[in-house]
Regions:
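Short, Lys/Arg-rich flexible segments
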Residues: 1-76, 81-83, 87-155
Length: 155
């Protein structure tokens, strides 16, 4: 008596696609947590003198899937500062613009994590060994690598 399958090749494909989507959602959710941790680190762990609040307000992240933004971190305007305008509005708007500009240039298919400091002088502050995104970048790389190993390890 032969054994007959009670499923089709289409059933197998559908099940595989479900599993892929489940893992994709898990990956995106983990990236959101990582993004929030890195954002918190970047905004609170800096050593530079925050004069206007713009640099701190220009820091943000997003997650893209196939070139489309599926989630963007909250843009908080900080009013910490030692002089001048201290509302962080300029930083926040430049951060959003820079993040969206970079996201539009992404040609990578799949899931992409982007984190930016949108003020034009951020690289100069980094060059003076004052942490803007360095520590957050290292944290993100470490956590994303650990997450990939955890989510996609073979049993």
């Amino acid at each position: 008596m032969p054994i007959k399958p009670n499923f089709t090749a289409a059933d197998i494909r559908a099940r595989m696609n479900q599993e892929i989507e489940r893992r994709k959602r898990g990956l995106i959710t983990q990236l959101l947590y990582i993004g929030e941790e890195c954002l918190k680190q970047a905004r609170s762990g800096h050593k530079y003198l925050n004069q206007t609040g713009n640099l701190c307000s220009s820091i943000g992240y997003c997650v893209l899937v196939d070139g489309e933004i599926v989630h963007e971190g909250e843009w908080k305007q900080t009013s910490e500062g030692k002089g001048g305008e201290k509302d962080g509005k300029t930083g926040s708007s430049q951060g959003v613009a820079f993040l969206h500009e970079l996201a539009a240039k992404q040609t990578t298919q799949g899931i992409v994590f982007l984190m930016v400091a949108g003020m034009p002088y951020a690289q100069y502050v980094e060059a003076m060994s004052l942490d803007v995104l360095d520590t957050s970048e290292q944290m993100a790389e470490r956590k994303i690598k650990a997450m990939r190993n955890r989510l996609f390890k073979t049993k």
